[in-house]
Amino acid sequence: KKELNRIIGREIENTLEKEVEFEKQDIVINVDLRKEPKVRIQINPLFIEGKYNKLVRGIPQTKWPCGKCKGKGCEECNFTGKQYRESVEELLSEPILEATNGWQAKFHGAGREDIDVLMLGSGRPFVLEIKEPKIRKINLDA
């Protein structure tokens, strides 16, 4: 098994001109040689840490499903499935998902906040988890 890992790693390095990192992997390639050979590629999540300020009241921290339809979409929510038009989670997630070509974003906020409060000062810490990002290096200053 170790020899096969070494051979596959060397081939990937030569083909992609990238150095294989065995300790902190961005991508894991599983090769199953029992019976019919199978290759499975696992793209590990990308974690982005930051702080946000909320300068306007009326924006929830996380996406809030419509109380009537529970997120499915109805006349009351204008078929959006959302109680509120936008959230801090969506405002942060959408441009990052687009930049990374990720599959899904998961917002991890440090603490909760009411919808009618501001978040001033040094900001509220958060971690944004991007699942299956195709692009891992992005300009966060943009």
Task: Tell me the role of every PLM-derived stretch.
Residues 1-142:
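Catalytic/RNA-binding core of pseudouridine synthases
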